[in-house]
């Protein structure tokens, strides 16, 4: 009988959580490995390196400032949101763009700051 991936997946889907746990334990014992996620073993210096290597940033609107209409227009241009959604975002604050490259995040911040908003890049 040939190995059939679809049948194997169907068999896994039919198993209970307890049966899956026992299967994982048996596989760990058989192959001499663990399924636990590796914990960061690096010293405190490793955290500093990770912060320096950050390539994606979130652009967060803190407040609209005095010129709310201009900020709403910029938010609409940047995000492509409708008028109501952009207004709600400007009124409540929040993430304008997630996981943006550094250059793009800074450009968005400059545009919104020029419109009068208070923006933070995280």
From Swiss-Prot:
Keyword Ribosomal protein: yes
Pfam entry (one): Ribosomal_L12_N
InterPro entries tied to this protein: Ribosomal_bL12 (IPR000206), Ribosomal_bL12_C (IPR013823), Ribosomal_bL12_C/ClpS-like (IPR014719), Ribosomal_bL12_oligo (IPR008932), Ribosomal_bL12_oligo_N_sf (IPR036235)
GO cellular component, one term: cytosolic large ribosomal subunit
Domain of life: Bacteria
One Gene Ontology biological process: translation
An example Gene Ontology molecular-function term: structural constituent of ribosome
Keywords: Ribonucleoprotein, Ribosomal protein
Family per record: Belongs to the bacterial ribosomal protein bL12 family.
Function: Forms part of the ribosomal stalk which helps the ribosome interact with GTP-bound translation factors. Is thus essential for accurate translation.
Assembly notes: Homodimer. Part of the ribosomal stalk of the 50S ribosomal subunit. Forms a multimeric L10(L12)X complex, where L10 forms an elongated spine to which 2 to 4 L12 dimers bind in a sequential fashion. Binds GTP-bound translation factors.
Protein name (database record): Large ribosomal subunit protein bL12
Species annotation: Fusobacterium nucleatum subsp. nucleatum (strain ATCC 25586 / DSM 15643 / BCRC 10681 / CIP 101130 / JCM 8532 / KCTC 2640 / LMG 13131 / VPI 4355)
Gene that encodes the chain: rplL
